Amino acid sequence: MKLKTFLIVGCLGGLFTLSSCTAPTNVKDYSAYVNPFIGTGGHGHTFPGAVVPHGMIQPSPDTRIDGWDACSGYYYADSTINGFSHTHVSGTGCCDYGDVLLMPTVGKQQYRTTDPQSQRLAYASSFSHKNEIAEPGYYSVFLDTYQVKAEISSTKRGAIHRYTFPENTESGFIIDLDYSLQRQTNSEMEIEVISDTEICGHKKTTYWAFDQYINFYAKSLE
């Protein structure tokens, strides 16, 4: 297997460190009772991605693009994933966001579907809920089309992606700035290649929120 890890930061200037500590004994873990899939069906309009409370970035899978049940980008009855975008609303009656879509792929892919009304992008992957995990701060799914395991976590201002690809395959990623939920208006899109392992970019969107500017930086930790 081949591992590739990405760090995507929504706002530069933050710093975080890791340190060791001793956990208190006899503390009940209430997070074990949390089910992030609650509200992802019916008209709940929630998403299962890994999010820090009040975090500025919300990495989560998108299974559809348009319609009332696409407000959060994820609908439990769906069986395909278009990719993992980094801005979402939860539990709202109006849709927005779905910015900076990242999708791992194997082999050469078509960029766009020929049907502009399709809920599925040309490079989408099928998946099964039996191979999907959502916990507080962690999301994982197996992408059947590419045989890739995707794992996502987040910090207050960044997202951490880890992908496990099949051995001896032509693996890669699609970063789609023109994608957005409800096909909102995207403009001023740009990606800059900083190095072999770093990119940055920006875009401007208009839908529920007018003149929204998105800036991002991504680095491969492979």
Predicted regions and their residues:
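Hydrophobic helical h-region of N-terminal Sec-dependent signal peptides
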Residues: I8-F16
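Bacterial N-terminal signal peptides that target proteins for export
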Residues: M1-I8
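Accessory carbohydrate-recognition regions in carbohydrate-active enzymes
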Residues: P24-E222
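C-terminal motif of bacterial Sec signal peptides marking the signal peptidase cleavage site
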Residues: L18-S20
